[in-house]
Amino acid sequence: MTLTVKGQATRGRILDATASYLRSDAPGDITLDDIRALTGTSKGQLFHYFPGGKEELLLAAIRREADHVIGDQQPQLDDLTDRRGWERWSAAVVARYRELGAHCPLAALMDQASAPGAAEVISALLADWRSRLTRGIRAMQDAGEARSDADAATVAASVIAGIQGGVQVLRATGETDTLEASLALHLEYLSR
């Protein structure tokens, strides 16, 4: 569907409101009436931009949140070629999650994993994220800045698990110390 500038803005507003709702403290089961109230749009507009209704809207919002998980880490995520690059990326990750607190895209995605189509979006996100981290670890290994005996893909998976765990602790406590510790320990392991 080709949209006018105004149509793109309306669709974007609907997606932003849905994503914001998904990141709220207890989103529960969102309804189209909830989205209408948040956006000031009519049911007709919702179905114009999302003919598949609630399922299509939620999946589009989930895709947007997945894009934010990677986008929020740029450009540092794609510059993991040395220790300083990893330190900059780690600092950016911690700063972003500290800013977002419990209302982060990663947590919202995991909370919606059972929504139709969400598992595929989350799997693709995690594969992309792991691939980028793996490339960074291999670049460090090639430069002699990371231990050569480390399996880059396995360490990348562990980094993601550490971030996810740190985010869950952040959601419960409001503190980033677990996230910071996980990132620091992974870098220390690679640097041995």
PLM regions and their residue ranges:
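N-terminal intrinsically disordered/low-complexity leader segments
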Residues: 1-9
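Helix-turn-helix
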Residues: 13, 17, 21-60
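Amphipathic alpha-helical interaction segments
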Residues: 13, 88, 92, 108, ...
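Short, basic, alpha-helical segments at the C-terminal edge of helix-turn-helix-like DNA-binding modules
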Residues: 62-69
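Amphipathic alpha-helical packing segments from all-alpha helical-bundle domains
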Residues: 70, 84, 103, 117-143, ...
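Hydrophobic alpha-helical connector segments
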Residues: 71-102, 152-159
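Amphipathic alpha-helical segments used for helix-helix packing
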Residues: 85, 98-117
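Amphipathic C-terminal alpha-helical segment
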Residues: 96-99, 139, 159-177, 189-192
